[in-house]
Each structure stands twice: as structure tokens, then as C-alpha cells.
Amino acid sequence: MSCGHVVSRSVRDSALMLDCTHGAAPGDPYAAPAPARPFADEVGADPDKLRIAVMNHGHDGEPLSAECSRAVSDTAKLLTDLGHTVEAADPGIDTMAVGRANRAIIAANTANMVRNRAKALGREPSGQDVEAATWAMVQLGNAVAGPDYADAVLQIHLLSRKLGAFFQDYALILSPPLRTPPLPLGTLNTQD
């Protein structure tokens, strides 16, 4: 899985690239609103006082490791000391439903990309063309029925609306990306 943009050395570099690349192309189905001022101007600027939601548990409601919980608590204290309003709040997202919807959408799109690439090469796609994990995703994507894909998109849109309502009250959510510290590099093998 990946996230599209740039690899940079600093937030300032990323902000400059966002200034160069933000905005929708004609015909894009979705577009973020234009920023009020350049992203680069935001780097180092003092933010207004923010209302921040804190989730000191996993997104699935499970407890965090002591190390992750301490990091969230320490960061919440720092933000409070900086004058922000920090309070426990959870948008109440069904992470299992979101996971199923994401998996269906990502798998179907992965299958489509691999199929289109193989078509451009004039042959059928095979597991020899991609990593084992990608091929497994292709197989899963080929099994996603049209109505299931449509429902997955609907679920993501409902999630988006729910989060949109939540962010009417909060500027951001402080939460750990994982319940435990990340696995060491090399632990996961996408070839098997």
C-alpha cells in the first residue's frame, strides 16, 4: 500500500510541493477546497488556539501499549501547555466496517490496475508480474462483486460525512497510528 505525494526532508519541502501540485485536474470527481494562503506560509506560523480531540486507545477501542499511551498523554500535555483545548473525544468509527470497505475498494482497484497494465503489455496478468501480497490483493479484488464495490464506496462516503460532522467541533484528532510500536524493518515480507 502506498500514499501518493512526495518524499521530502522537511515539512517545509512538503508544503512547497503542495503549493506546486494542489488542486484538481479538469474532470476530477473529488477536489479539496483551495487553501486560504500558500501551504509554505503555514510552516512556522502560530496556529490559532485549537480544540483537539484525544483518543488514548486504539481506533478499534482496544488499549494501547504503555509506550504508545505515554506518547499520546505526553503530546496531549504539551498541546495543553501551548494553550490548546485538549479533551477526550472519539468520532465513534466502526473500524471493522471501514476496514472491509477499504479492502474491497483497494483490492478491486489493484486488480483493475494490474489487469490494465497486463492488457497494455498484450498478455494476461500472472502472479509472476507482481509481489505475492499484490497478487493476493488482485485475487481478492477479482472476487469483489459490483454491488459490494458500490456498497463499499457508500460506506466510505458515510464515514466521510460522520468525520466531517465531528470536525465541525474539533480541529484534529490526536491518536496513535498503531496500538503498539511499529515492527522492525524487514519483519513483514510481501514476497511470501
Predicted feature residues:
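Conserved dinucleotide-binding and phosphotransfer motif residues
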Residues: 82
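Short helix-loop capping/hinge segments that flank enzyme active sites or metal/cofactor-binding pockets
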Residues: 41-56, 105-164, 177-189
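A short helix-breaking turn/cap at a secondary-structure junction
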Residues: 1-75, 93, 116, 124
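Short glycine-/acidic-enriched loop or helix-start segments at secondary-structure transitions
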Residues: 63-64, 98, 183-186
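General small-molecule cofactor/ligand-binding pocket signal
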Residues: 85-90
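A non-catalytic, amphipathic alpha-helix used as a structural packing/dimerization or gating element
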Residues: 13-16, 71-74, 78, 151-158, ...
